[in-house]
Amino acid sequence: AGWGEAWRPWGARRSQVVSGRGGARTFVTATEGNHGRGVAWAARLLGHKSVFYMPKGSSMERLENIRAQGAYAEITDQNYDGAVRLADQMAKQNGWILVQDTAWPGYEEIPAWIMQGYTTIAQEIFGQLKENNLQMPTHLFLQAGVGSFAGAMLGSFAARLGKDCPVTCIVEPDKADCLYRSARSGTITPVTGDMDSMMAGLCC
């Protein structure tokens, strides 16, 4: 099946989740800023409510950007993983919809939708390269974050270019190097403690 056929059931399910049928819904997520601002904007646009839990060290500017969309947002005393657990707990307690780009067993559908959204960035890159008669890049440098952006981008390039996929480097703060540690150990390895980095939005 082509992209259109594969996309159809996902699109129908997404429509059910975000539709206004049954009244306003409440979406909740953990965020360090960018993801949350987008969710807050979409919730406001569609007439829904949104709640955000931000990890300690998040900037006041990002907090206020989210609140400016009419959302409830607070900076917690948790690191990013702790904020995710809090958002998940509050979703279960209150019947809210968790919109998280971090996946775990039993919570994979919505993160997959978010990754599908990220693939539009790759499609824009392909389109602009073709429009300007430019060659495909030889190297990709991608932020790690929680892995969804990097996975979506690398997957898009690998699916399109196959063996000609660019050499790819995934970059993360040295205080939040869980992907690096996991790759070295061969098993999922969390990072605990304070994640002090000038790239606070990537300390997840």
Task: Tell what function each PLM region has.
Residues 10-29, 37-90, 179-190:
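Active-site-proximal loop->helix
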Residues 27-33, 142-146, 172:
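Active-site nucleophile and cofactor-binding loops and adjacent substrate-binding regions
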Residues 33-35, 43, 66, 125, ...:
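Buried hydrophobic positions in well-ordered alpha/beta secondary-structure cores of metabolic enzymes
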Residues 48-62, 139, 160-175:
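Short, acidic/small-residue loops that bind anionic groups at enzyme active sites
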Residues 51, 74, 97-99, 141, ...:
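Hydrophobic/aromatic beta-strand patches that form the interior of the parallel beta-sheet core
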Residues 81-88, 95-107, 159-204:
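Active-site/ligand-binding loops adjacent to catalytic centers
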Residues 97-161:
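Active-site/ligand-binding-proximal alpha/beta "capping" segment
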